[in-house]
A protein has these predicted regions:
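Short, well-ordered beta-strand segments in beta-rich or mixed alpha/beta enzyme
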Residues: 3-9, 41-72
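Coil-to-beta-strand transition motifs
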Residues: 1-3, 34
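An amphipathic, aromatic/His-enriched active-site/gating alpha helix that lines ligand/cofactor pockets
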Residues: 33-37, 52, 60-96
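Short, low-complexity intrinsically disordered segments
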Residues: 10, 16-19, 65, 84
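Short hydrophobic/aromatic patches at helix-to-coil boundaries
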Residues: 97-101
Length: 101
């Protein structure tokens, strides 16, 4: 299994709207691609929140092929939708992890 992790620092001014959008729109749209089996949204603790809270969105793929299919076929459009909606009020970095145990 593979976990696609997106860590996001968001501006305080969008926190409530962004959380609602993630839960009701964005994460369901990612799952609807059929590339991931499940998702979860986490809030990081013990981090500097001066500029805003930090979250991690995690998506679990059964195999590398499913993850690669998402990156090739779906990620560019979904990322653009995020930028179109929120502009520069968030920053994100991505990582991929393989479950070993």
């Amino acid at each position: 299994m593979f976990i696609y992790n997106i860590t996001l620092k968001i501006d305080w001014s969008i926190e409530n709207d962004w959380l609602q959008w993630m839960k009701e729109e964005h994460m369901p749209e990612v799952l609807a691609t059929g590339c991931f089996e499940k998702s979860q949204l986490l809030r990081l603790i013990e981090v500097d929140e001066t500029d805003g809270p930090t979250f991690a969105a995690q998506y679990t793929a059964a195999n590398r092929e499913a993850y690669d299919r998402f990156i090739s076929n779906h990620a560019p459009d979904l990322r653009q939708k995020s930028f179109d909606k929120w502009g520069n009020r968030f920053v994100a970095f991505r990582s991929v992890m393989e479950v070993v145990h």
